[in-house]
Each structure stands twice: as structure tokens, then as C-alpha cells.
Amino acid sequence: METMASPGKDNYRMKSYKNNALNPEEMRRRREEEGIQLRKQKREQQLFKRRNVELINEEAAMFDSLLMDSYVSSTTGESVITREMVEMLFSDDSDLQLATTQKFRKLLSKEPSPPIDEVINTPGVVDRFVEFLKRNENCTLQFEAAWALTNIASGTSQQTKIVIEAGAVPIFIELLNSDFEDVQEQAVWALGNIAGDSSLCRDYVLNCSILNPLLTLLTKSTRLTMTRNAVWALSNLCRGKNPPPEFAKVSPCLPVLSRLLFSSDSDLLADACWALSYLSDGPNEKIQAVIDSGVCRRLVELLMHNDYKVASPALRAVGNIVTGDDIQTQVILNCSALPCLLHLLSSSKESIRKEACWTISNITAGNRAQIQAVIDANIFPVLIEILQKAEFRTRKEAAWAITNATSGGTPEQIRYLVSLGCIKPLCDLLTVMDSKIVQVALNGLENILRLGEQESKRSGSGVNPYCGLIEEAYGLDKIEFLQSHENQEIYQKAFDLIEHYFGVEDDDSSLAPQVDETQQQFIFQQPEAPMEGFQL
């Protein structure tokens, strides 16, 4: 790997990617890792699938109790679905059809483990529910069948697949235009569950032309629960990275999302922000489309929302936008984002602090004016405190932010970081297990040492003022130790730093690593310990 800023490239900023410590592929991988980590957390504030569980009223309680008794007895081996129920479902009597569909729906609404497999393994039942979806003359039957199918689709991928294979998706999309709001809402819910299952299911729903009717519904609906469900379904249509949805098929939702960001409902705001975070997660063309929709100022305002479930996805969206080029990053800065990010660095939520550091790290990977804006916002003192005290995953992001600033900053800006005490916490990172972060810390220290060398030449003193600071922070000992690191890039960098900035006066060639031609790696001799042991 090339050094972060080799002597021949001191004043050269690579324009093809945000962080000139890394090549473009590495930077892309870093952003993907962020996404994976987020998915692993199974975000508590957003479920990809939702089961519709009714609130039982007293009138229905006795019937439900009897039904539940029957369900409990099924655990002893008896089937919860009787032959009579199936016969009634296939009856020509619409009243019997409705009553039986309600029975199935109630079973499928039971928590915590509804008998989904038993229902889908009963021949013809799912197909019958799909058939009932077409009964425009009987909206109550449509609603009950849609509810039952929604709860089946809330299950495993295999269970969701059964609903798709029965041909439900195109009919659900037609029902988005139903004259009955309950039917519309249940159709939205079902489609959200199906789209939330996998990228394959998401793309199938998109290819069935869901977007226009869904956006029409979002534009016209005045029912809050409907709008909430529709925005949640929309966020599932935008979600996913491997692969992402075809951008042309989801980008038409941007104007609607822009309007929804001014809702006063936290649930709705959260899902709108998640949708925007998904849409902005990718190449600069996607980021530009999000910027052009006019959402940036409102997203920055929502960083200060008092509900964590809104501030978190707003931060993710803002963070994704600043992974773009310097001009795109500047759009966010022009919305007064830095005071908000400074505020978030003191959040009680570690995940928010980490995301804020990650966002700032992409701003400090920008141009010198942008680094200066971070300085002027008084953010670096807090970052350096985080670098010393926070959880490791947050310290990592703070390290990126500081090293990026040393990479692209002016001499004055780098001196400012040194004056804040950035050297010791960077030295402390040299002993961590994460090789990438060791490299980040080494790169930051190298940038500082390079500046010191330039200053010593200019002053004629011949003394690099930063070598002593690194030695005082036990950094030299740690860099020497890294010469035996298993990672080739780390031990080569450590050797180069020692040789160039801390070279011994007698220039003992025996200290240089030998090269193992067969293994294509350096071999470092183990230094002999003095008889009385090492004195640290």
C-alpha cells in the first residue's frame, strides 16, 4: 500500500475518492462494513417485517379463548386446523367464507408463535386467500384475507415465498387503489413485509410496478397509520446493498420523501430518514440525486431531533452524503451541520457518537477549507478526548477523522492538532489488534513527522520537534515493536519511520531487515536483551 502522503505527493490531493489514505476499493469496503455492522444490530427502532396483531376486545374474547384452547391442544399432536374449517373456507357461502377467514386470521395473529407452517401446508388455503383478495364486491373478506396473508409473509423467507408464488403481489398492488382504506392499508402492510424479506423479493415487488400507486397513496392519504405503513414499505423497497435496488426504480420517491420529512410523527420521520439513508448509500450519482431533491437542510435539522430513532437515521443519511466529493460535502456544511455533529459527539448513545465520528472523518477527508471548518467548530478537542476514552469502535472513527486531517491539512492545521495533544492517543493505538487502525495511526504520525522534518530544515536546527513528543508518548518503543508485526505493510511502515526519522547515528546496516526471497517478506532479527532485562 502506498503511504498516506509520500514525500512526492505532499500537496497532491487525490480526487477520485474521499480518503487518500486508502485506494478507492478500500474506501468502498469501509463503507460496506459500516452497513453490515448496522444490519447486525437489527436496529431496535426499525423492523423489516411486522406482524399485524389485533387488540382483542371483550366481545371477541370468548371466541378467541376457545380458539386459543384449540391452538394449545394442537401442541399435543392434534391439528389446529380442522377439516371443517377447510370445508367452510371452500364453501360457496360468502358468510361462511368470511367467518372462516377470520378464524384463520386470528390464529395467524397469535403471539409469539403463530401456526404459519400448518396453515401454508394445508392444501389450497393460501391460494384461497389470494382468490378472496379479488372479491371487490366484499371488502371485508378482502381485508381479512389480506390480513391473514400479511401475517404469513411476516414469517420466514420460505413462508414469504409461498405468498409470492400464489400470485398475491400484483393483486396487493391493485388493492392500493381500493376504495376502502382498511383494504389499502392491509395491502401496503403485506407488500412491505414481502419487500422486507430479501433483495430478491424487493426487486420482484418493484418489478411489479408498485412505486407509482404507492406514491399516489402516500400523497393522498390522510390516515396516519396508512402513511406510516406506506413509508415503512417504501423504506424496505429502498433498502439493501447486495445488490441495491435499481436506482431508477426507486429514485422517483425522492420528492415524496422530501415532503414527508416535515411530518411531526416520529415513526414516519424515522422511516423516511432510513429510506433516504439507503438511497444516499452508494456512488456520487446517487448522492447527487438525493441532494437535488432538497432534503439536506431538513436532514441536518433532524440531527437534533429529541427522539433517537429519528436522529439516528438522519445522521446515517448525512454521513452517507459526505462520503461524496468535496462539493457534495460542502452542501451539508452549508446547512450548519458541524454544530449539530459536535452536539452528537456528546450523545448518551455510543452508536450515535460513533456515527458522528464517522461522518466527521469523511468531512476531514475533504479540502483544507473543510478541515478548517471542523477546526472552527471546535470539534477536534472533543475528538481527541474520544480518541483517549471511548469504546474502541468509536475511537477507531475518531482516529480516521484526525489522521485524515493530518493528511490533507495545512502545516498550521497539523500544528493545531499537535497542540491539542493528538500524538499520545495516536501512539496508544499502535498496540491494538485491529491492523487497519494501526496503519491509520502510523499514517497520522508519519504526516506529523514529515511536517516536523520540513520545519527543521526551514529553521536550520536539524531537530524534528515531533520526534521527542512521540518518544515521550512511548510511541518510538511501540513503532520499534511493530517491526515484528505479522502484517507486511505495518512492519515495512514501522521500519521506514524508524529509519527515516529516528535513525541511529552509526547507521548500523545490521539493523535493516533481511529479505526472504522464497517467502517474499522481510525477516527481522530479534534484538538481544541486556542481561538485566529491558528497562522501559
Curated annotation (Swiss-Prot):
What Gene Ontology molecular function terms does this protein carry?
Answer: nuclear import signal receptor activity
Gene3D superfamilies listed in its UniProt record? Importin-alpha, importin-beta-binding domain (1.20.5.690), Leucine-rich Repeat Variant (1.25.10.10)
Region Disordered: which residues? 1-29
- The segments carrying the ARM repeats are 76-115, 116-159, 160-204, 205-243, 244-288, 289-328, 329-370, 371-410, 411-453, 457-502
Q: Which residues carry this modification: Phosphoserine?
A: S6, S113
One GO cellular component, as annotated: nucleoplasm
Tell where it localizes.
Cytoplasm
- Annotated region (NLS binding site (minor)) at 316-404
Q: Would I find Phosphoprotein among this entry's keywords?
A: yes
**Keywords assigned:** Acetylation, Cytoplasm, Phosphoprotein, Protein transport, Repeat, Transport
Cite the record's note on assembly.
Answer: Forms a complex with importin subunit beta-1. Interacts with ZIC3.
**UniProt name for this protein:** Importin subunit alpha-7
What does the record give as the organism's lineage? Answer: Eukaryota, Metazoa, Chordata, Craniata, Vertebrata
Name the encoding gene, please: Kpna6
